Each structure stands twice: as structure tokens, then as C-alpha cells.
């Protein structure tokens, strides 16, 4: 584990590998960044936009410790919840360019198993956004967040992850009618071994064959 002393130092360290929020871009599943754009950023040809002043980003940053605290209280019978630090970075034991900054570390009280806590906040202002969290009438995780959790499991080697999301509904006729809902999704490492192997293979190839050799990857278009 490495503990950067500042946000700027953390950003510089992120240039040396692939972080959790970037994993989906490697395989063409990010709605915000293509694999080619990510390659440009990692090779110094482009700079990631500064989104620190974005209202949704600020809300998520400020809400995270509160939501993590509520999760810890609600699940005190099941998990010990720990906060590692805002900039603490956990590295893959074999591939140090695969790393993660975690929202929390969980210890399952009954078994002692280690797990990841990933906190998400999202504002749903139209019905199409709600559909990302529902599939066939059942709650689900948006693909880019699922890939982020898989990446974190790769970096840590831990047994499971819990994605704890607050959904804030803001669409409707009344702008003051805001409802919130919190959901927890359990992702077991043992249930996704093939997915983990696939993601690791793609991330290793992207870094060693594209970034380190300075060869632009072919553009991966998202499935429609």
C-alpha cells in the first residue's frame, strides 16, 4: 500500500497505472472515456479534465463519509467497516500498474474474510438513468461500476465487495420532490473468476503492449 501526501501526488501516481474508475475504459465500457483517450492520458498526449468542481462530484465526495457511516451502523452485526484514507492506494501483487483507492475495507465478522466497500451516489433526473440500475425488473449495477469493482478485487485479491449506492430521484413535476434510496449489492469473487481473468488479461495487455510500447490501441466501440 502507498499513501500519497496530497491530492496532486495521488494524481501523479495514477498516471503510472490503471485505477478502478479507468478500468471500464480499457475494455470500451466507459460512458466517459474511450480506450484511446485513456491511452493518450497515460502516455502524456492528453490530460484528464478537472471535474473536482462538478456539482455531482462534489456531492459524492461530501456524501461518501456519511453514507459509509450509515452503512457501518446498519451492518455492524455483519461487517467491521474501516476507512483506509482518501488517497491510500492498494497495488496488485504481480502487476503494480493495477491499483485501487478504496472507499472502505470490510471484514466479515463470521468468517474473517476481507472485502471492499465501494460507495456510489447518483442523481436520477430522467427515467432512462433509472434503467441503468434495473434490468428485467430487478435491481442491477451499471456496467462501468461493476467493472470498477472487479478491478478492485484484482488489485486487492480480497474475497468480496459490497457496492453501496444512494440513488437520488429528482425527476417529476415538483422540483422539491426529491426521494433517496440506498441499495447494497454483494459481489463475490468466486462468482466472477472468468470475468476477473478476462479483465486482468485486457488491463495487462493495454499497459504492457500499448502504454509501455507507446502503441495506440484500436478504438473499442461500446455495444449498442
Predicted feature locations:
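Charged, glycine-rich intrinsically disordered N-terminal tails and low-complexity linkers that flank
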Residues: 1-62, 66
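Residues that form generic nucleotide/phosphate-binding pockets
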Residues: 13-14, 26, 38-42, 70, ...
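Intrinsically disordered, low-complexity boundary segments flanking structured domains
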Residues: 25, 66-70, 170-174
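Acidic-basic catalytic patches of nuclease active cores, encompassing PD-(D/E)XK
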Residues: 57-83
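Nucleic-acid nuclease catalytic cores
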Residues: 73-102, 106-211
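Long, amphipathic alpha-helical segments that form or neighbor coiled-coils/leucine zippers used
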Residues: 216-224
Amino acid at each position: 500500500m502507498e499513501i500519497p501526501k496530497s491530492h496532486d501526488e495521488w494524481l501523479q501516481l495514477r498516471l503510472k497505472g490503471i485505477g478502478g474508475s479507468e478500468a471500464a475504459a480499457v475494455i470500451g465500457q466507459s460512458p466517459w472515456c474511450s480506450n484511446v483517450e485513456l491511452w493518450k492520458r497515460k502516455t502524456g498526449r492528453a490530460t484528464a479534465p478537472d471535474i473536482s468542481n462538478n456539482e455531482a462530484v462534489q456531492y459524492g465526495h461530501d456524501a461518501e463519509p456519511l453514507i459509509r457511516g450509515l452503512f457501518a451502523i446498519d451492518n455492524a452485526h455483519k461487517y467491521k467497516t474501516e476507512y483506509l484514507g482518501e488517497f491510500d492506494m492498494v497495488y496488485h501483487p504481480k502487476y503494480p500498474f493495477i491499483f485501487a483507492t478504496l472507499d472502505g475495507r470490510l471484514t466479515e465478522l463470521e468468517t474473517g474474510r476481507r472485502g471492499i466497500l465501494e460507495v456510489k451516489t447518483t442523481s436520477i433526473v430522467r427515467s432512462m438513468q433509472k434503467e441503468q440500475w434495473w434490468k428485467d425488473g430487478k435491481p442491477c449495477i451499471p456496467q462501468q461500476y461493476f467493472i470498477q469493482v472487479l478491478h478492485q478485487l484484482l488489485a486487492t485479491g480480497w474475497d468480496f465487495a459490497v457496492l453501496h449506492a444512494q440513488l437520488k430521484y429528482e425527476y417529476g413535476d415538483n422540483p422539491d420532490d426529491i426521494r433517496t434510496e440506498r441499495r447494497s449489492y454483494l459481489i463475490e469473487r468466486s462468482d466472477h473468476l472468468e470475468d476477473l481473468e478476462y479483465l486482468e488479461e485486457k488491463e495487462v495487455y493495454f499497459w504492457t503492449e500499448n502504454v509501455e510500447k507507446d502503441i495506440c490501441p484500436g478504438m473499442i466501440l461500446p455495444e449498442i
